[in-house]
């Protein structure tokens, strides 16, 4: 959500930032809507002030025994009372029109975000190479999984349709191990507090993190006013909704392992085989709530925490700074971590870490009280995958595959697998 006062103070800067996003100028339209709102507020206030003044005049007229004047004034009060609901409605409608327009506009990119229309404009930030030799060929994860019978898309399709999977046996245990490993790392070494949140949330929570209203078609509704979460970012960030925190409480750092649900409305024809793009998947999420001056530093810290997962798994990856045309709706700046996937001979996104500034905080009314009497302001919010568990499973399977179809268990995961060192390939 944008601050209309900031737009009024510097409309040219606002329009320049929208242009970087590929959008037309909107400041004039927004200021016009705000003028209507201000006019409605002024009209309602003027009517109330007139009623207050009339009450005093009526008292004076009665005291002077001027009944004719008192009757005239009371008639005007009655008229103003009759008009009041309409003035209040006009005020509410004007405020709603402005808020709805502001809510539909994406966040303003930071100055250092590279320009670009789509993913081709993204810029490599850094990379990490595994200590193991990179595989230049190999089977894809679904070929490995189906050959062992431990990854069953056919059974999932009978249960739920396309873009679902059933994992069994040691592969199911490996996915569970990955999630537990990530949580232990983030809570034990990175200072995050583990949370087990609801996966059904109200519409207000989805609005707060900006999944709604713009991305309604990408979500799964569940009954009246409930939505399945597309990411734990939604409940974790909304933990500070409608609250005023003390600056000494910041930063807050939350992590959660949850199932996530996405309709993938715009993904027709993409990644139709395998686990890369599912309607339901598990993900470890990281969320930070900070004071404004600390959010840039926290963004780099969060990125390093997500990277640590892949480094400990000894997986090759690169970090990309997303360009203005590829970053998310609520983001000021985003880093994507892309892991090497030998079966496709390419890098695929496994984590996205974003700083949102006060964009989500304004939608949630999440504030903090600054020290030394500096007043109350909006917090900054950050979110990142720490990481997507299903995609981590893909990366482990494909990067640790052996010629016989078996998969070596990374040493970091072996304690979570009861000491198991490999998942056997198909029996001949």
From Swiss-Prot:
Q: Where found in the cell?
A: Cytoplasm
Pfam families according to UniProt: Seryl_tRNA_N (PF02403), tRNA-synt_2b (PF00587)
Q: Name one GO cellular component term.
A: cytoplasm
Q: Does the keyword GTP-binding apply?
A: no
Annotated GO molecular function terms are: ATP binding; serine-tRNA ligase activity
Q: Per its UniProt record, what InterPro entries does this chain match?
A: aa-tRNA-synt_IIb, aa-tRNA-synth_II, aa-tRNA-synth_II/BPL/LPL, Ser-tRNA-ligase_type_1, Ser-tRNA-synth_1_N, SerRS_1_N_sf, SerRS_core, tRNA-bd_arm
Q: Which residues bind L-serine?
A: 231-233, 285, 385
Sorted keywords for this record are: Aminoacyl-tRNA synthetase, ATP-binding, Cytoplasm, Ligase, Nucleotide-binding, Protein biosynthesis
Q: Which reaction does it catalyse?
A: tRNA(Ser) + L-serine + ATP = L-seryl-tRNA(Ser) + AMP + diphosphate + H(+); tRNA(Sec) + L-serine + ATP = L-seryl-tRNA(Sec) + AMP + diphosphate + H(+)
- Top-level EC class: ligase
HAMAP family named among the record's database cross-references: Ser_tRNA_synth_type1
- Function statement: Catalyzes the attachment of serine to tRNA(Ser). Is also able to aminoacylate tRNA(Sec) with serine, to form the misacylated tRNA L-seryl-tRNA(Sec), which will be further converted into selenocysteinyl-tRNA(Sec).
**Assembly and binders:** Homodimer. The tRNA molecule binds across the dimer.
Query: Domain description from the entry?
Result: Consists of two distinct domains, a catalytic core and a N-terminal extension that is involved in tRNA binding.
What is this protein called in UniProt?
Serine--tRNA ligase
Its encoding gene is what?
serS
